[in-house]
UniProtKB/Swiss-Prot annotation:
GO terms for biological process: virion assembly. This is Matrix protein. Homodimer. Dimerization is critical for virion formation. Interacts with host ANP32B. Keywords: Host cell membrane, Host membrane, Host-virus interaction, Lipid-binding, Membrane, Viral envelope protein, Viral matrix protein, Virion.
Length: 300
């Protein structure tokens, strides 16, 4: 299972009521447990998690759990020894957390994703950044319908003003062995044969899960690590959208394929080719995903 707590970064030992500085969400990673969700939430809310600001290439937050979990059996050391995360991925306003006052993270609620098999697969970052001459980049433009923030204590104030939001993910490149470029129609045919299925989960925040149920290009299959299922967490793709979805309900309303030149220099020459799903080529497992409920992605 993958747990995703959301809570408040606040002063550790205030003389009066705790002063909340910002909202945060440190993904603790994967673990195994047979406990009920209510028991896992109780343990998360009682945890003593220390938060400290630090910096490297960018500003970071260090989370240290002084009360290691007993119900889930962690697969990694993060839930027991702590973790250091990009501040923009784990906090909505790190600039408000003071250095001269000890800070802690207090969990308010959490979501739990139970994959249908042993885990999930994310495409390596180097492969996502790989570009090739005379190749066509296959991207997806995902449109989410966002309901207003949940609960009386809203952390996100502008959720009502943003009924829909989009983010783009890179799937891979279509490339011939010879120095010839595939036509847009040929790429569209290959996409239709893939039989793509999409759903939302809760790994590292609200995550997009894809599964190919049909025939896949050998080159594209190799780029995806010879896997037919992939996970794309928005916390790695679009940090602003990820923070927006912390306290919002959302569902997929539209998925479009976008064909672009693989090499950035050619973007100024060739226009985008947008393929709308008018014939139901893409299948979406349509469930409204609230942030404070268990989420189940498609079969991995």
């Amino acid at each position: 299972m993958h747990m995703f707590p959301l809570g408040v970064v606040e002063d550790s030992d205030p003389p009066g009521p705790p002063i909340g500085r910002a909202s945060g969400s440190p993904p603790p990673g994967a673990g195994r447990s047979t406990a009920k969700p209510e028991e896992l939430l109780k343990e998360a809310t009682e945890a003593n998690i220390v938060v400290r600001r630090t910096a490297g290439l960018n500003e970071k937050l260090a989370f240290h759990n002084n009360t290691p979990p007993t119900l889930p059996t962690p697969r990694r050391k993060a839930p027991t020894t702590g973790s250091v995360l990009n501040a923009n991925q784990a906090c909505n306003a790190v600039n408000l957390a003071p250095l001269d006052t000890p800070q802690r993270f207090r969990a308010v609620y959490m979501s739990i994703t139970r994959p249908l098999d042993n885990g999930y697969y994310t495409v390596p970052r180097r492969m996502l950044e790989f570009r090739s001459v005379n190749a066509v980049a296959f991207n997806l433009l995902v449109t989410l319908r966002i309901d207003k923030a949940i609960g009386p204590g809203k952390i996100i104030d502008n959720a009502e003003q943003l009924p829909e939001a989009t983010f783009m993910v890179h799937i891979g490149d279509f490339r011939r062995k010879k120095s010839e470029v595939y036509s847009a129609d040929y790429c569209k045919m290959k996409i239709e044969k893939m039989g793509l299925v999409f759903a939302l989960g809760g790994i590292g925040g609200t995550s997009l899960h894809t599964r190919s149920t049909g025939k896949m290009s050998k080159t594209l299959h190799a780029q995806l690590g010879f896997k037919k299922t992939s996970c794309y967490p928005p916390m790695d793709i679009n940090e602003d959208l990820n923070r927006l979805l912390w306290r919002s309900r959302c569902k997929i309303v539209r998925i479009q394929a976008v064909l672009q030149p693989s090499v950035p220099q050619e973007l100024r020459i060739y226009d985008d080719v947008i393929i709308n799903d008018d014939q139901g080529v893409f299948k979406v497992l349509q469930t409204v995903v609230p942030s404070n409920a268990r989420k189940r992605p498609p079969s991995q």
